[in-house]
Amino acid sequence: AKFVASLIVIGIMLFVLGFLVMGFGLIAIGIPPTAEEFWRIVFFLITSIFYVAFWLNLAILFSLRFRQAATSALASVAVWLFFSVFYTMIVNLVAKGLSPSQMASPYQIISYQKFILGLMRLAPSELFNEATTTLLMPSVRSIGPLTMEQVQGAIPSPLPLGQSLLVVWPQLTGLIAATVICFAISYIMFMRREIRSR
């Protein structure tokens, strides 16, 4: 109940702020957004809610794990700082250490890039950035390395909304899965504590 109520309040705030920005933009520019642009913004706001839901669930998990409020708050901030700042630095060090030689084949280079990209996608912020960039920029056609065979024959035109959603579906699934996992762990810990107290 605490999670659902908090998420509803955050979702309402995000949608209100998003529509306020759209309204100010309409007043300043004078050009209304198209239907596809409007729905892109709506899906961007929904993605933002999923991202916030993950951190909210993680904060609830730490509040159940640690009895002191200050400790749980510091743990949440520490995890956020790690993934936002230090995780990228660690992945860059790994990338430099595992970088292929100049004589490597294109497929080895692509495999290396996919591996590093997979490490980066372990961070929720990276999943959120990839999803929002693809949703808000129709010119983004792929968020991973491509071979020359895949590039050849591609039409250089903006992707429709449906195709952009297909591109970012793995990122959205990852955010939802991480949120569900944190929620399940929090629920199990809460039920165990209730059973022991009785």
Regions found by a protein language model. Give the residues of each.
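Short helix-to-coil transition segments within interhelical loops
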Residues: 1-2
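Secretory targeting signals
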Residues: 5-67
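Residue-level recognition of pore/gate-forming positions within transmembrane alpha-helices
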Residues: 6, 10, 14, 77-81, ...
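Membrane-embedded alpha-helical segments of multi-pass transporters/permeases
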Residues: 15-26, 85-89, 183-188
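Transmembrane helix-loop junctions in multipass membrane proteins, especially transporters and channels
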Residues: 22, 26-34, 64-68, 92-100, ...
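A structural motif at transmembrane helix-loop-helix junctions in multipass membrane proteins
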Residues: 44-87, 92, 101
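Terminal transmembrane helical anchor/hairpin motif
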Residues: 81, 85-172, 184
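Junction motif at the cytosolic side of a transmembrane helix
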Residues: 173-198
